[in-house]
Amino acid sequence: MSSDAASPVVTRIAPSPTGTMHIGTARTGLFNWLFARKHGGKFVLRIEDTDRERSTPEATQAILDGMAWLGLDYDGEAVSQFARADRHREVAEQMLAEGHAYKCFSTQDEIAAFRDAAKADGRSTLFLSPWREASDHPDAPYVIRLKAPRDGTTVIRDRVQSDVTIQNATLDDMILLRSDGTPTYMHAVVVDDHDMGVTHVVRGDDHLNNAARQIQIYAAMGWAEPVWSHIPLIHGDDGKKLSKRHGATGVMEYAEMGIPAAAMRNYLTRLGWSHGDEELFTDEQARDWFDLDGIGKSPSRLDMKKLANVTGWHIARTDDADLVAQIEGYLALTGAPALSQAQHDGLTRAMYCLKDRAKSLPDLLDKGRFVLENRPFDYDEKSVTMLDPVSRSILRELTAQLQNARWTRDTLEGVLNAAADSHGLKFGKLAGPLRAALSGRSVSPSVFDMMLVIGRDETLARLDEAASLT
């Protein structure tokens, strides 16, 4: 299969539920989701839960939560790999019956002794089972091994890495079924991908060598291979393997940081894929533009500054009401108190003046404190300094002058500039005390925006309160 649209596209995400959803898994899922959605295909979810000791319901839920937050909707029901163990055994038994696999009775001690001797002799430690061609079998525990080719080469035709040729002499007779009858991951993946109709396998390049081994199962069963695309991993900003010291590694950590999901999708899509020089784009553009040929061969680097810039671009272009809804979701996720109706309405009115230069949802909350907090204000230290006796006197005058003023930006600018002029001040000198009076803080949105958002009555009440400080 060489064409993106040779058959109805089916892609998958197949995480192991052994912890949080890693950002690398999220990006892989996003690439698969974009490709399927672009081609009108299916995107399916398989939970690879064969490691029963490490797989937990909580970790499975973490995967579902991460996908839901990122907006990666999948088709059909989630599939449990563990629940398909009978099917995996069935295929292994078929391969055994058809001569593509064999029973191996070698013990762990015998395998270890083989490798020790090979190492001592300077030979390859690749285990060569003496049972590969045996027909006389003892009554003893055994595993079922793939009968891998010993001669020639296997070519992985990869859309990202190009053709990769593997010498078959380097392939092991990998185990398909353990002695207790449970399937191995390497075997189960192939059976599941085939049965689920997966046409394109897009996964990390740490699985590239696995592909050469898994191709043998496809060949033995007479199944068509999927289109392979092995994508480079994500590194830290220093070029080393991504770890906690580089920043958050779990996708829900970004949700808890208040990164909007749309911004995260944009950033992750661009992390290892490109469409010309485009850095900032919408979901619709990503779906239209995404293709496998745009994925680079080199590892991408996590860059938190670039993520902040992407986030700022998306916040500035998001509908005000939608941003308030996202803030409510963020507060619920982090366990913070929910917005009251008054706070909800105030944020909605104020959002137009909060979005400028905001890099996260918490930034919006911080800028919006003037509509979230009630009087009396707990003035910050700088605000108290700004509200000196002279400033408080000017605020008292302004309170009287604003009583009957038309509540428009032009009128307010005229009144405040006239007040500054009458005291021989530039408006910037008056803006500080006004910010302090209207928000209780030294940093806030513009004075005029705050006055328009909170209205005449609340503005006058705040000016009066600040003017009355002693």
Swiss-Prot record:
Record's catalysed reaction(s): tRNA(Glu) + L-glutamate + ATP = L-glutamyl-tRNA(Glu) + AMP + diphosphate
Record has ATP-binding as a keyword: yes
Entry-linked Gene3D superfamilies: 1.10.10.350, HUPs
Principal EC category: ligase
Cellular localisation: Cytoplasm
GO cellular component, one term: cytosol
GO terms classed as biological process: glutamyl-tRNA aminoacylation
Function recorded in the entry: Catalyzes the attachment of glutamate to tRNA(Glu) in a two-step reaction: glutamate is first activated by ATP to form Glu-AMP and then transferred to the acceptor end of tRNA(Glu).
UniProt similarity note: Belongs to the class-I aminoacyl-tRNA synthetase family. Glutamate--tRNA ligase type 1 subfamily.
Protein's recorded name: Glutamate--tRNA ligase 1
Gene name, Swiss-Prot/TrEMBL: gltX1
